[in-house]
Structures are given as structure tokens and as C-alpha cells.
């Protein structure tokens, strides 16, 4: 299974003028890749993710997943937003099942499996208002992965969480990735998060958004953010931000 982003460009119309948001984005992922996308605010990271998800069909170029051209949402793509977007009137297990019936034994068993994977045992009958923000985001992760998507797209899913919760969810996500080998594309503003999670870091520049540099990250798992090798990768990423004039903008 491959994911191909081929020549993707995107324009927005603003009153009497047209603004280019993305310019000729090209990269490929193989099954089991974990790619993080990082860059200045406004460089089109989230727009690119929505295009890959099939949520935005007005663009130039092609998105090919497992040989199929993507023009709309499908089971091939799971998507996790910056906020969890749970239904407040549904329990944890009902939110994970979403439009599938828990009366179906297969669905019930799959939901139970994902409850265990994201470490929500004992909270199946709880409602969103009764659990923390971090737990709610774990529900969102389980919901997105229940249908076994070819690729999981994550748009800064931990950005609004405190440092301890974010660190915990990074471990949960890595555990899922190691177990399921789901291909992942993860948008973040956090350089350390990008290095900690992925095996490839795509650095984007802005106005219009384009790929500035792709850095391979071959650090073995589990990773330590205080290790010398981790800091060497961090230095490489920061050097690319400086060379591209990206460090002047908040990342």
C-alpha cells in the first residue's frame, strides 16, 4: 500500500484576488510509514491534510491511495481533528462505534479491542463530560482506527493538551503504530514531537506552502528526547528552519 501526493497545488479566492496556498507538493509514503509535517503557521499543513482526507476536492494534482484516486472521504482515510469532536449524548463505546451498531458482535468486539488499546477500560459507559480532554482524544483515535483505514491523518491532535497528557498520548499513539503498522501523517507545530514520533519529517515553507526539506529520522524506538542523537536531529531541523528563513515565524 502506498500513498502518493503528486503535484498538489491549492488556490483560494479572496474577493478580487486569488491566493496560492500550496505549490507543487510531492511525496510518497509506504505502508507503515510515520510522517510528521511541520512548518510556519499558514503554510498549508492542515489544508494539505484535508486534501489527502478527501475533505477538500478543489485542488490541482492527485492523491493516490493504494492505486485509487482520492476525491472524497472514504474508509481508506481516518482523520483526527485538533479537537475530539465527540457526540456529547453518546457514551465512550458508542462514540467509538459511531454509526455502527454495538448490537453487532463483530462491532462490539472491535470496540472492546480499541478500548483496551487506548487504555480506556472501565470508561466504556462514560459520557464525554465525565472524562478528561486527553481521554476524549483517545476516544477520537479509537473511533478513527476502528474501520482499519489505510492511512491515519492527524491534525495537531495533542496541541491543546498539557505537556504531561501530550507525552502520555504520544506513547499511546506509538504503541498503536507499532502494533497495527498503520500509515500515519501527523501535522504538528512542535519540533520535539515531530522528531519523537516519526521516521520522516517534512518541513514546509509558507506563502505559498511548499516542501522545503524532508529529513529522514532513523533514531531507534523507544526514543529519548534528552539523548545526544535526538538533539542532533533537532539541530538539523532547526538549521533547515534558519536556512529557509522559517525561524522568524512561529512554528
UniProtKB/Swiss-Prot annotation:
The entry's keywords: ATP-binding, Cell membrane, Membrane, Nucleotide-binding, Translocase, Transport
A single GO molecular function term of this UniProt record: ATP hydrolysis activity
Function: Part of the ABC transporter complex SsuABC involved in aliphatic sulfonates import. Responsible for energy coupling to the transport system.
Gene Ontology cellular-component annotations: plasma membrane
Protein's name according to its UniProt entry: Aliphatic sulfonates import ATP-binding protein SsuB
Domain of life assignment: Bacteria
Positions that bind ATP: 39-46
Record localization: Cell membrane
Residue ranges of domain ABC transporter in the record: 3-231
Catalytic activity as recorded in UniProt: ATP + H2O + aliphatic sulfonate-[sulfonate-binding protein]Side 1 = ADP + phosphate + aliphatic sulfonateSide 2 + [sulfonate-binding protein]Side 1
Mode of membrane association: Peripheral membrane protein
CDD domains per record: ABC_NrtD_SsuB_transporters (cd03293)
Listed SUPFAM superfamilies: P-loop containing nucleoside triphosphate hydrolases
Primary localisation category: membrane
Pfam families in alphabetical order: ABC_tran
SMART domains: AAA (SM00382)
Protein family per UniProt: Belongs to the ABC transporter superfamily. Aliphatic sulfonates importer (TC 3.A.1.17.2) family.
Coiled coil: none
Record Gene3D superfamilies: P-loop containing nucleotide triphosphate hydrolases (3.40.50.300)
Amino acid at each position: 500500500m502506498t500513498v502518493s501526493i503528486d503535484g498538489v497545488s491549492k488556490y483560494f479566492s479572496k474577493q478580487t484576488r486569488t491566493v496560492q496556498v500550496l505549490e507543487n507538493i510531492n511525496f510518497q509514503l509506504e505502508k507503515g510509514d510515520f510522517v510528521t509535517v511541520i512548518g510556519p503557521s499558514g503554510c498549508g499543513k492542515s489544508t494539505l491534510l484535508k486534501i489527502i482526507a478527501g475533505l477538500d476536492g478543489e485542488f490541482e494534482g492527485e492523491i493516490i491511495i493504494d492505486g485509487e484516486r482520492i476525491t472524497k472521504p472514504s474508509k481508506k482515510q481516518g482523520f483526527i481533528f485538533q479537537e475530539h469532536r465527540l457526540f456529547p449524548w453518546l457514551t465512550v463505546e458508542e462514540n467509538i462505534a459511531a454509526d455502527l451498531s454495538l448490537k453487532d458482535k463483530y462491532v462490539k468486539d472491535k470496540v472492546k479491542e480499541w478500548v483496551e488499546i487506548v487504555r480506556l477500560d472501565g470508561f466504556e459507559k462514560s459520557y464525554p463530560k465525565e472524562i478528561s480532554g486527553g481521554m476524549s482524544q483517545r476516544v477520537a483515535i479509537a473511533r478513527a482506527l476502528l474501520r482499519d483505514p489505510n492511512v491515519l491523518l492527524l491534525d495537531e491532535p495533542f496541541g491543546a493538551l498539557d505537556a504531561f497528557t501530550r507525552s502520555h498520548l504520544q506513547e499511546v499513539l506509538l504503541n498503536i503504530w507499532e502494533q497495527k503498522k498503520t500509515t500515519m501523517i501527523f501535522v504538528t507545530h512542535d519540533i520535539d514531537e515531530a522528531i519523537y514520533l516519526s521516521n520522516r519529517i517534512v518541513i514546509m515553507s509558507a506563502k505559498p506552502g511548499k516542501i522545503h526539506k524532508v529529513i529522514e529520522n532513523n533514531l531507534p524506538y523507544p526514543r529519548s528526547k534528552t539523548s545526544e542523537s535526538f538533539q542532533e536531529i533537532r539541530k538539523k531541523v532547526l538549521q533547515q528552519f534558519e536556512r529557509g528563513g522559517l525561524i522568524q515565524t512561529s512554528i
